[in-house]
Amino acid sequence: MAQTPNPSRRSLVGPPPHPFLTPRPERRQLELRWADGGSQSSARRSGVGLTGGGGGGGGGSEMKDCEANVQVVLRCRPLSEEEQRANVQSAISCDDLKREVTVLHSLFKQADKTFTFDKVFGPKAQQRSIYDRAVKPIVKDVLEGYNCTVFAFGQTGTGKTYTMEGEMRQKASELSATAGVIPRAVRDIFDILEERKADYSMKVTFLELYNEEITDLLALEDQSRFPEDRQKRAISLMEDRKGGAVIRGLEEVVVYSASEIYNLLEHGSARRRTADTALNKQSSRSHSVFSIYIHVKETTVGNQELLKCGRLNLVDLAGSENIARSGAREGRAREAGEMNKSLLTLGRVITALVEHSVHVPYRDSKLTRLLRESLGGKAKTCIIATVSPSIHCLEETVVTLDYAYRAKSIKNKPEANQKVCKSVILKDLYQEMERMKQDVKAAREKNGIYIPQERFALEEAEKKTMRDKIEYLETQNKELKMNIESCKKEYLDLEEAHSRANISLKEKEFIISNLLHAEQSIVERAKDIRGALENASGDISALVDKLGRQSNTEAENKGLLFDFRSQLDHGLDLLHDTVVGCVCEQRQFLESMNEQNKIYFSAKSESTSQLERRIAKAKDIYASGVQCMNQLANTLHQRSIAHSEQMGLNILSHATRAANFLAVMVSEAEQVSNDVFKSISELKELLAFSADQQEVMFKRDLVSAQVMSKTSIDFFEDIRGHASRLIEHMEQSQAESSSQLLKFEEDFKELSVREEQAALDKIAGILAGLTAKKSTMVLDCVGQLNGKCREEQKHLKLQISNLQKVSDSGGKEAAAYAAKVESQFSEDKLSHCKIKDQMEDILQQSLKKTVHSVSYWSHTETSLEHLNKISVVEADDFIEETRKENESILQKMLIVSTQNDAKFAAITSDMLTAVKDSHLRDSESRMRIETVFATSSDHLEMLDTKHSQGTESIRSMTAKCLERDYKANSPVRRRPGELMTNAYSLESIEQLRTPVPDLVVKFRSENNLDEVDKGKRYVDQGTRTPRSPLMPVNHYNK
């Protein structure tokens, strides 16, 4: 594979020559073709050009039929330091976002004028921004195989050269911030190619157009000449047959890096003609064109290597200038005139292209001839119009803006260049290398004549012109000689043909004169024949009529047969349509029945799944309810024990306090005898407080007991409610299942009856058996499922009724316990009231018998102690009895709950097992039904096929009998006039013909003519007769 020419990879160069591996920069002259995008030397390569406009080539062309407008970019330079010092006003304003440039005519009391362009860059725009936004896409198109042109256009001193070139020198490996379009495009091209790792080659050319003369800026200078003569080496510009410009003798240099191109640019720019004017200290006095040719190798699908060619033309035009303002004199004035002339021609070309003029004046200037492809051709073009903001240059600025705005409307037709086959280029290069080797060998051996290069090129051009002219004249001479020979031969042929034609005419005149006599005799005999035929025409007419009637009868019979055939075909079609309709209806019925079964089984499966989920949910609800009930029972039991213990402790503490109080009363009776009334009153208050406290405690115990009882009752009520809802749900589910089963049974029976009525005899028998089997199977399945569901419902109702009974008994026991606690509270309250009343009576008696109270203290103490003991014992007995009853109730409830849990788990497991068994039976039934449906479909297909075959067989037999086997008489085609009763023999008829060959021989013998040899004498005689040879005969005919 070829390697990209890179100095760091030159060690990889192999021994054979290769177009991509040139060991050193090469300078050679070529004929550069501008108008069609390729060089003349490339155009000679086996008919393969570099542009896409010449038809098919080895690699094909990539065309774009769509037209593209020329891209116009406007750049406004900032005011110079001198203009700023002079306070020169700015006459234009730039809007980069709106891409508009406004000419401020308001300074002259006129309306402002606005121009819109593809891109607008104001005075603060940087070089990099201009390149990235305007030129970088053009560079990418060049690498895709297009010819592209970028040129700067504007007044002198507006920054065209600065925009195109800028500062060439690099700072380290980076470009300067002021680098222009050309160095940035070169750097981008190398960066993109290196990034793609492409195999490529690159060549550059650099020319100058000064005073309508083209100069090669890269040509080697002749050091033997004076410096003023070195600049006068001009190159000729010619046109080919297509009207394209051809530059002969322009050198192209192979380059390998960007630095080489920079050096060539600096070298060529230094040789350009510049001068100091009043408007620009370094004004370019010529147009320059720097061209980059890029060849990139591509590999096709078939591993064929092609070369993609692209060209980038970077044009720096000289600026138009006002001679009066620039201060040009004599030679400088003539230079400015030539520049303005070429730029004016460019303006006329732009105007003609915009106005779609028939004639575009490309040939009026060499500049427009060079830019012909870029303006209205096949290249992509970008025009950078540069203007000055100074009010002093307003007129030139408006002209530039006007031309740039018009150039926007120019339409090019960009076409990608043809991809040239690598083998063609290699062959061409090998031939050129052989020629160069011969030249080097001749130079080494000093075997030849050495003359200056310019004269040698001129002489070679003249020699070539002469050779071409000589070849053209020789070709013309040969063609003329061949024309003379062909004319002589044609003359002899015509002379011979003329003599033969005269002889033939004489022969025909003689034949015609004899034929007239023969015709007379034929007419007479024809009259005799006509009389005989008229006699026989009556008999022949009668016979023909009879044959016509027979033919009509045969035709009518044949028509009847064809009518019968059409009716038979129609009947067979109707029968076939009927059978097909029945088969289709049966098939649709089977499919709908299959769909109904699928829907039923899917619904049954869904209902089974829902039933399983509901059973699981009921199981969870039951378990949670039982757990909650157990928790509530345990809580109630614990609270009852705690309240009983609290009640015992309260009674014991009360008794203890009473005993202690009596003891204190006895011990201090003597001390408080004086204060007895006060003590009695305090005792009353203490007794009232104690009674109230005991009453509050009793009420609190009663409320807690009521709350526990109400909670238990509510729990049992919830269980009863859940059980009732579960029963309702089971009944509803059972009713839905029964209704669905009944509906399925009814639908199935209706479909079976309809199927039996609609099918044919044979199919009816099969389907009747299938329907009976399916009906029996479905009925059995439905009966089993109904029985199972009823048994499960009964069992579930029994369990739920047991659960309700347990909940009812638990509720009744809780209510009885609550009533018992309430009655006990009432009894305790009454006893407490009685004790309170007794105490009050005692206190009243004590008040009355205060004097005798000491004697009764012992008796009172004994009575109170006995009373406390009795109350404590009764309370302890009641608490113990209550605790035992609660424990027994709790044990019973736990036993019943355990039994119910076991029964409920067994019931739910049985229900789940039954549901799963039902689901399995449904799956088996579904498989059997699908098998039956498939068998029925196959039978229907077989019936349809057999019926179609039988119908076709009947039709073929009918066609055979009516078309091939049916025999009919052939109609008589002979007419009455064709028969002759008195016909002549063949010999007599042949005698009526004119003996033409004998007459010709006789004619020639009488006139002493011997074939064609004596044609000339006959021609001479014939030419002397002034009349036409057929005139007597025609006259006779008249």
UniProtKB/Swiss-Prot annotation:
Coiled-coil zones: 453-502
Domain Kinesin motor: 69-410
Originating gene: KIN5B
Natural source organism: Oryza sativa subsp. japonica
Biased composition (Basic and acidic residues): 24-34
Any GO molecular function: plus-end-directed microtubule motor activity
Subcellular location, record wording: Cytoplasm, Cytoskeleton; Cytoplasm, Cytoskeleton, Spindle
Entry GO terms, CC: cytoplasm; mitotic spindle; spindle microtubule
Source organism, top-level taxon: Eukaryota
Cytoplasm in keyword set: yes
Keywords: ATP-binding, Coiled coil, Cytoplasm, Cytoskeleton, Microtubule, Motor protein, Nucleotide-binding
Protein name (database record): Kinesin-like protein KIN-5B
